[in-house]
Amino acid sequence: PSTGMPTKTEQADLLQAMYGRNGESPLPVLAAKSSTDCFDTALEACRIAVKYRTPVIMLSDGYLANGSEPWRLPDLSAIEPIDPNFATEPNHADHEGTPKFNPMERDPVTLARAFAIPGTPGLEHRIGGLEKSARTAAISYDPSNHEEMVHTRQAKVDAVVADIDDLEVMD
């Protein structure tokens, strides 16, 4: 929520970022430690968002936004590309053996769903913000499906935690 005043160095928006959504929707929250760290933090946020197909919040504050410090432009060729790994063909067969695209099929490690560029012939599917059935992508209000999706979202965040280095705290 905007107060008309940027967040100061206390990062008072942390709890809002962590819990300020409807229902149980955990997601990764990152924060830059300095002005020079903003680039790396934004890059990491993008990597996580694409790899795990989950929203990521990156926190900043007035101190970082208005601060300045020397920053060496990185060698862009040394940065590992972020591959969206778009689906380009059907990923399963229906009960008759016909190849179909199931957007709810998940990577077993990241739990990321298959994602096709909207409008790709043969890979059409429903997208939007309403919760979908864990298996069919049809909109679902079923309580057991909702519980499964809540656990899936939490498992994604847990996988992100396991994928990043431990936080180094400086005294």
Task: Please give the residue ranges for each predicted region.
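N-terminal start-of-chain detector that recognizes signal peptides
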Residues: 1-4, 29, 149-154
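Flexible, low-complexity linker and terminal segments
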Residues: 41-171
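Active-site/ligand-binding-proximal alpha/beta "capping" segment
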Residues: 26-47
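Flexible glycine/proline-rich, aromatic-decorated loop/lid segments
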Residues: 1-24
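Acidic, glycine-rich active-site loops and adjacent beta-strand->loop/helix elements
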Residues: 1-2, 34-36, 62-65
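Conserved structured core elements
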Residues: 8-11, 35-39, 147
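Short, surface-exposed connector motifs at secondary-structure boundaries
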Residues: 25-26, 171
